[in-house]
Design a protein with these regions (language model features):
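N-terminal signal peptide c-region/cleavage motif recognized by signal peptidases
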Residues: 23-24
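Ligand-binding "clamshell"
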Residues: 30, 131, 252-264
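Alpha-to-beta junction loops
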Residues: 32, 95, 111, 143-145, ...
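N-terminal lobe/hinge region of extracytoplasmic solute-binding protein
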Residues: 35-85, 113-116, 185
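Aromatic- and charge-enriched surface segment that lines or borders ligand/interaction sites
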Residues: 79-124, 146, 234
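Surface-exposed binding/hinge segments that line
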Residues: 128-172
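Gly/Pro-rich hinge or "lid" segments in bacterial periplasmic/extracellular proteins
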Residues: 161-215, 219-221
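Ligand-site clamp/hinge motif
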Residues: 207-253
Length: 264
């Protein structure tokens, strides 16, 4: 089994790590261990501007769309959408049969709850400006959502494809309030197990995941390892399956190790 170190620019490689672990492309089974260079400050995707933290939240959360490895927008919880001729009204057809980790249904009302939350200035969420072009959000029916913009904005779907535009369980938001930052409940491939602040954020395979056959691994652990040499050593000893970031001099050394794949 080859270990992987990602030394690509952070915006593309880190956000792919959770998906790579879930796909099992380098793991036959078991748990994926990801050694990362900093401690996430929250697990609320709407309240961080840190790419590392956003990457971790992708373990548990999904949005209507996402960027693939080539930075092209792909459908996730939205199956399709239409735009009015004036560019103001977006109507989305949502994916049926999707459940949150708490067993509640994903639907248009859930999307509205999340967008209304981030747009509410009283909540003071860090990603609010990403959604400030939205005038209103309407749940037309359980699987149809309508978003009206204040003015036409061509890259609007890109805003919804960003990992911060994740859909949190409304029931969990009601239960935890601001503490949702420590109790993530989404529709992603892994459900939250625990967060030991200096040790690891742990997720387990979500048996009710809508994408059949995924995830390919039983669990994932994000371990904050602040020292570069320690992350490199963890790859070599098998204590970690992925590591990010590492300096180029470390990458050059690891390229010579047969069981380690360096992606640049």
């Amino acid at each position: 089994m080859k270990k992987t170190i990602h030394s690509r620019r952070i915006a593309s490689s880190l956000l792919a790590l959770a998906a790579l672990a879930a796909s099992g492309s380098v793991l036959a089974a078991g748990n994926a261990i990801l050694a990362i260079g900093q401690q996430p400050e929250t697990l609320d995707p709407y309240n961080t501007n840190t790419t590392m933290t956003t990457a971790v939240t992708k373990t548990f959360y999904e949005g209507l769309f996402q960027f693939d490895k080539d930075l092209k927008v792909r459908n996730v919880l939205a199956e399709s959408y239409d735009v009015s001729k004036d560019g103001l009204v977006y109507t989305f057809k949502l994916r049926a049969g999707v459940k949150f980790h708490d067993g509640t249904e994903f639907n248009a009302a859930a999307v509205k709850t999340n967008l209304d939350r981030v747009m509410n200035p009283e909540n003071r969420l860090l990603r609010a400006t990403q959604f400030n072009r939205i005038a209103k959000v309407e749940a037309v029916n359980p699987l149809s959502l309508r978003i009206t913009l204040k003015e036409p904005f061509g890259p609007f779907i890109n805003s919804l494809a960003h990992a911060s535009a994740a859909i949190i369980s409304p029931a969990a938001l009601q239960k935890w309030g601001k503490d949702i930052a420590f109790h993530p409940v989404g529709t992603g491939p892994f459900e939250f197990v625990e967060w030991k602040q200096t040790e690891a954020i742990v997720g387990k395979k979500f048996d009710g995941y809508w994408k059949k056959g995924y995830p390919k691994v039983d669990g994932v652990s994000w371990k904050p390892v602040l020292e570069n040499n320690t992350r490199a050593a963890m790859l070599q000893t098998g204590e970690a399956d992925f590591a990010y970031p590492l300096p180029y001099e470390q990458a050059a050394i690891l390229k010579k190790v047969d069981k380690i794949e360096v992606v640049t």
